[in-house]
């Protein structure tokens, strides 16, 4: 989760709000807290054993919530529910986030592990408006069972944010010999 922490460190300041959709992979909480940010929960709704995003609740978080949400952490496909978001679901989500100028950190480490009949849609395929306010995090470790590799990569299309990220990472631990 070093990538998530590093991106949060670049795009937030202590006290900023970060939206997390629970239930979710617990290290998202630690990364957010370690940056001094406030966790704002947007719980997933479970209907007929199927988890869904609560768009109305998400929209309400931008109207009066203090601190105003600055970052949204997306887990796609979702860990812990296994939910693969449809293109339409993601587009609706991104429309809300763009409207409120909210940065997107998309953890897509399970992108290559989806059940038959489902298709993963990466955050980087939703156009320039999304692309300029996103960071995609992923790694080979899940797909190829290489957890010990402990190496991941981050895609940040926005030049200014990518430069700040590289500056933040300078002098910090790099990859191992195999990564």
Language model features with spans:
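PLP-dependent aminotransferase class I/II
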Residues: 133-179
């Amino acid at each position: 989760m070093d990538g998530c922490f590093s991106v949060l460190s670049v795009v937030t300041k202590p006290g900023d709000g970060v939206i997390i959709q629970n239930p979710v992979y617990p290290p998202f909480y630690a990364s957010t807290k370690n940056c001094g940010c406030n966790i704002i929960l947007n719980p997933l709704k479970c209907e007929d054993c199927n988890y869904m995003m609560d768009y109305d609740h998400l929209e309400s978080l931008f109207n009066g919530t203090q601190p105003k949400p600055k970052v949204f952490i997306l887990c796609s496909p979702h860990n812990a529910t296994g939910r693969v978001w449809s293109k339409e679901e993601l587009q609706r989500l991104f429309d809300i986030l763009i409207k409120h100028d909210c940065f997107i950190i998309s953890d897509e480490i399970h992108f290559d592990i989806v059940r038959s009949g489902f298709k993963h849609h990466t955050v980087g395929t939703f156009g320039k408006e999304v692309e300029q306010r996103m960071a995609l995090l992923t790694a080979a470790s899940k797909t190829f069972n290489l957890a010990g590799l402990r190496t991941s990569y981050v895609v940040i299309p926005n030049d200014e944010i990518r430069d700040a990220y590289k500056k933040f990472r300078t002098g910090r631990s790099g990859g191992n010999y195999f990564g």
